Regions:
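Metallo-beta-lactamase
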Residues: 2-52, 100-118
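Flexible loop residues that form catalytic
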Residues: 6, 58, 127
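Catalytic core of the metallo-beta-lactamase
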Residues: 29-83
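Cap/insert and terminal regions of metallo-dependent hydrolase folds
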Residues: 64, 69-147
Length: 147
C-alpha cells in the first residue's frame, strides 16, 4: 500500500481526532499491509507518481498517470472533489489540519502539473466528469464496459 508517512502516522496516532474525522486505526493497523511510505511527491511505478496534496487529510495524495502512448491524467481525488473546486480553486469542504487557502494551493499545484504536461486534471467525485470520462475512454480506447 503506497501512502504518505503523514497519513499513516495520523491514522495510527491513537488520539481521538482521527476517528472524529472518520479515519479509523483499524484501517491502518493491519499486519498484512505492506506499507510503502513516501514523504512528498514520488514515482511509485513507471508512469505513476504520487503527489502529496495534504489538506483533506494530513497525507492525502493525488496521482499523475502517464500513458504509454502519450498523454495522461492528473487524478486529484479528494484534493478537488468537483470541477468547481478546480475551476474556482475552492477548497474541499472537509480539511484536517489545513486552511482553505492551503487546500486551494494544492489545487493550484495540480493545475500546474497538468498544464506543464498537457494532461487532463480529473476531480475526485464529480458526477458529470467521471461518467463522461469513462464513456470517452470506452469509445476511444476500446475499454469494455462492466456488465
Amino acid at each position: 500500500m503506497h501512502a504518505q508517512r503523514a497519513e499513516l502516522e495520523y491514522g495510527l496516532s491513537g488520539s481521538a481526532e482521527p476517528e472524529a474525522n472518520d479515519i479509523f486505526r483499524i484501517d491502518f493497523d493491519d499486519p498484512r499491509i505492506d506499507w510503502r511510505l513516501a514523504e512528498g511527491d514520488t514515482e511509485i511505478a513507471p508512469g505513476v507518481t504520487a503527489v502529496l496534496t495534504a489538506g483533506h487529510t494530513p497525507g492525502h495524495q493525488s496521482f499523475v498517470v502517464s500513458r504509454a502512448g502519450g498523454g495522461g491524467f492528473v487524478f486529484a481525488f479528494d484534493a478537488a472533489d468537483l470541477s468547481e473546486n478546480i475551476e474556482r480553486e475552492v477548497s474541499v469542504g472537509t480539511r484536517i489540519g489545513a486552511s482553505a487557502e492551503q487546500c486551494a494551493e494544492q489545487i493550484r499545484k495540480l493545475k500546474r502539473i497538468a498544464a506543464q504536461r498537457g494532461y487532463r486534471l480529473v476531480p475526485g467525485h464529480d458526477p458529470v466528469v467521471w461518467p463522461a470520462l469513462t464513456a470517452e475512454l470506452t469509445v476511444t480506447r476500446g475499454l469494455v464496459k462492466p456488465p
